[in-house]
Structure formats: structure tokens, C-alpha cells
Amino acid sequence: MFKTLYARIAIYSITVILFSALISFVLTNVYYHYNLKASNDAKIMKTLKEARQYEQSAKPTHIQQYFKHLGQMNYQIMTVDQKGHKTFYGEPFREDTLSQNAINNVLNNKDYHGIKDKPFALFVTGFFDNVTDNTVGINFKTKDGSIAVFMRPDIGETFSEFRTFLAVLLMLLLFISISLVIASTYSIIRPVKKLKLATERLIDGDFETPIKQTRKDEIGTLQYHFNKMRESLGQVDQMRQHFVQNVSHEIKTPLTHIHHLLSELQQTSDKTLRQQYINDIYTITTQLSGLTTELLLLSELDNHQHLLFDDKIQVDQLIKDIIRHEQFAADEKSLIILADLESINFLGNQRLLHQALSNLLINAIKYTDVGGAIDIALQHSHNNIIFTISNDGSPISPQAEARLFERFYKVSKHDNSNGLGLAITKSIIELHHGTIQFTQSNEYVTTFTITLPNNSH
């Protein structure tokens, strides 16, 4: 229905103003009906009886002139004689609605309280209802006999100037209110329009241009969070570009090497060299296969909504299986693996946890000096599960330590890994609501510590 927020707020505000005016009118009408109507009736009845008392004491020659004089004093009067003849004085009534029964009762000396007894009407205020049944009436004794006199104040005449003033006041009130509503709506919508333009810039890839935070209300909070979102999206875009560059480099280098080996393979007839080239190509393709596998795993971890973490895992047995699987690689370097494992159960994703712990052991074997030792420990600590793996090897600089868990980061340029192992491990541990930390002692003993919640209860 509304194509703009500006129109929606303006229409809603104007509707509220008009609806409030209507409700106020109805409530005022109710207040008059239940609180003022009876006292108003009594005041007018008192005035009419005082007029009768004066007429009886003063004995004016022409009773009609007397009523005419009352009419000129802003009263509306209707007289009815015993023959049913009606005479009106003052401003005319809008409608003659008085019943014959009411007239007969007054002629029989019974007072008429039409103002007090006026039925309630929701949208008609009895105070202003200019009809003959909305009057008070009493019997007047004249030389020509009894007459019924009905009277009410001429509200229109009495309040004509005030009514004009009130009408002007209401018109100005509505005009100023609506003008202020439109102006205030524009002040609300203007920053929203700026946000819209800023989102369009984001769609076009502009993550550098901030929007000025001009307010401290909800709009200002929205502006603040928009700027934070813009910064985050800019960082994500930089990471994406960096990721694409790294993947391109990791794939391009081995493909170039394979291309070179295939050229050499075509040009040589030496069986020994040909076999060496084939072995090298096989090694490189194996590395490429590992890279694609890890890239797919990273993508799975980034879009983890479908992953389940309800496997009942015997963690100590899982570590033993990993050690047994990597024992051959450790034996090739004459490494000793010492494991102190408590029997611990954990609820999580066994495939992913196996991958994370395997990465740490493979790294430890890779970077431990020949003849060295690797220490593995698993234990309870309060409400947590603590896993540590330590090994002695070459020291790592503080700069390298700070970037250790970045994707594609390699401590050494001569490292033949793809730099994804620790990044994958960190993502897996965090998906299990755990943490991983790296520490290094003065004796160049490096330690990875994984802390997981004890959720097996």
C-alpha cells in the first residue's frame, strides 16, 4: 500500500492525530452526559423559574414582549397555549421534536427536564443540540390562561465568537501538527535514505566510504552497526581476495612444475630419468589432491550448519588410533611418542576431531628433530578436557607465532605444506566450543593445548 517509509510514517501520524481528536470528542461527550447535563438542566430551570416569578410580580402588559425580550438575551423560547398554538422567540430551533405528551404535562403544572433526560448520542453533544425536546419547561399563568414555556440557552449566539475562535484554533492546530509530522518524518527518513545509498555502494564493492553517525537514538545505533558491518565486509572481501591469490599460487606452482616435468619427459629417452619424472609428477599430484581435500574441508567448516556434533567419542582411544596410524612416520625419524591418556568421553563430530588431532601429531612429527620425543597428554580439569602435545624443534619467531593459525601461512618458505592444517584444526576446535593455544619454552619445546568442554554428562 505504501511505497515509501516517509508516506507510511506521515499517514500513520496524521491518522493518530485525527483518531485522537475523534476519541477526545467522544470522551468529552460522555463526560458532559454523565457529569454536566443534570447541573446544566438545573441552572436553566432556575433561570426559567426566576423569569416566571418576575412575570408574576411585575405583571407585564404584553407577555409576548416579555418573551421576546428574553429571546434577545440569547435564549431560545417556545410557548404553547392550551389550544396547541406554538410561538417561538429568539433564534429558531433547528427542529421541533418536542412530544405532545411533554407539552400536556407542562400545561398540567408538571415541570419538564428535557436537557437532563436527553438520551445519550455518541457523536451528538447534547449541549449543542438545538432542538425543542432539549429544553426545560414550566407552566406560566397569564390573563389568557396557562401556557407551557420551554427554554434553552442559545449556544450558537452565546458562543458565536468563541466558536469562530475555536474553529480557527483547531484548524491551526491541525495544520501545524500535520506540518510538524511531515517535517519530523523527513528528519527520520533522511538518514535512512543515506543508509540506502550506502548499501548500494556496498553492493558495488565500495567498503571504504563510511556513513557519518549523526544521532544517538536507534537510527544512530543503526548507523554505528552499519559501519561495523561495512568494516567486517571489507575484511571479508580482503580475506577472499587473499584466499583466491593463495589458492591460485598453491595450484599454479605445482602445475607449472608438472608442465616442466612433462616437457622433460617427452624429450628424454633415459628410463631412469623418465621414472624419476613420473615419480615427481605423482608426488605433486598427490599434494594437489591433498590441497583440494583440505580446501573442501575448509568450505565445509565455513558452512557448518549441516554438521552434526552428537557422536559419542572415546577420546583416549581416538588418540591411540591416530598414534598407531602415524607410527610409521615417527619411526622413520626415530621419534619416541609418549602418551599419558585418561579415559575420557566426549560428545562431538568424530570425523572432524580425528582430523584436528591428526594435524597436530603430523606437524609434531614433521618438525621434531631426528631422535627427538613427542609428549601427548589427555586429562580432566574441572569442567574441561585438556589435550596437550609437545615436541622439541626449531624455535618460532614471535611474528610467525602471531600468524600460526592463518590460512596458507607457512613458517618457512621452504615448507612443502600448503599452510592449511593449523587453520583447519582451529576451526574444528572452535566448532566444538573449545580453544587452542600455542606456547613455546626457552628450551624450544613447542606445545599446543586444546581445551574442550566436558559435555559427556
Swiss-Prot record:
<keyword id="KW-0547">Nucleotide-binding</keyword>
<feature type="modified residue" description="Phosphohistidine; by autocatalysis">
    <location>
        <position position="249"/>
    </location>
</feature>
<dbReference type="InterPro" id="IPR005467">
    <property type="entry name" value="His_kinase_dom"/>
</dbReference>
<dbReference type="InterPro" id="IPR036097">
    <property type="entry name" value="HisK_dim/P_sf"/>
</dbReference>
<keyword id="KW-0597">Phosphoprotein</keyword>
<keyword id="KW-1133">Transmembrane helix</keyword>
<dbReference type="Pfam" id="PF00672">
    <property type="entry name" value="HAMP"/>
</dbReference>
<keyword id="KW-1003">Cell membrane</keyword>
<keyword id="KW-0808">Transferase</keyword>
<feature type="domain" description="Histidine kinase">
    <location>
        <begin position="246"/>
        <end position="456"/>
    </location>
</feature>
<dbReference type="GO" id="GO:0005524">
    <property type="term" value="F:ATP binding"/>
</dbReference>
<feature type="transmembrane region" description="Helical">
    <location>
        <begin position="164"/>
        <end position="184"/>
    </location>
</feature>
<dbReference type="InterPro" id="IPR003661">
    <property type="entry name" value="HisK_dim/P_dom"/>
</dbReference>
<dbReference type="InterPro" id="IPR050398">
    <property type="entry name" value="Bact_Sensor_His_Kinase"/>
</dbReference>
<protein>
    <recommendedName>
        <fullName>Heme sensor protein HssS</fullName>
        <ecNumber>2.7.13.3</ecNumber>
    </recommendedName>
</protein>
<dbReference type="InterPro" id="IPR004358">
    <property type="entry name" value="Sig_transdc_His_kin-like_C"/>
</dbReference>
<dbReference type="InterPro" id="IPR036890">
    <property type="entry name" value="HATPase_C_sf"/>
</dbReference>
<dbReference type="Pfam" id="PF00512">
    <property type="entry name" value="HisKA"/>
</dbReference>
<keyword id="KW-0472">Membrane</keyword>
<keyword id="KW-0418">Kinase</keyword>
<keyword id="KW-0843">Virulence</keyword>
<feature type="transmembrane region" description="Helical">
    <location>
        <begin position="9"/>
        <end position="29"/>
    </location>
</feature>
<keyword id="KW-0812">Transmembrane</keyword>
<dbReference type="GO" id="GO:0000155">
    <property type="term" value="F:phosphorelay sensor kinase activity"/>
</dbReference>
<feature type="domain" description="HAMP">
    <location>
        <begin position="186"/>
        <end position="238"/>
    </location>
</feature>
<keyword id="KW-0902">Two-component regulatory system</keyword>
<dbReference type="GO" id="GO:0005886">
    <property type="term" value="C:plasma membrane"/>
</dbReference>
<dbReference type="InterPro" id="IPR003660">
    <property type="entry name" value="HAMP_dom"/>
</dbReference>
<dbReference type="Pfam" id="PF02518">
    <property type="entry name" value="HATPase_c"/>
</dbReference>
<comment type="function">
    <text>Member of the two-component regulatory system HssS/HssR involved in intracellular heme homeostasis and tempering of staphylococcal virulence. HssS functions as a heme sensor histidine kinase which is autophosphorylated at a histidine residue and transfers its phosphate group to an aspartate residue of HssR. HssR/HssS activates the expression of hrtAB, an efflux pump, in response to extracellular heme, hemin, hemoglobin or blood.</text>
</comment>
<keyword id="KW-0067">ATP-binding</keyword>
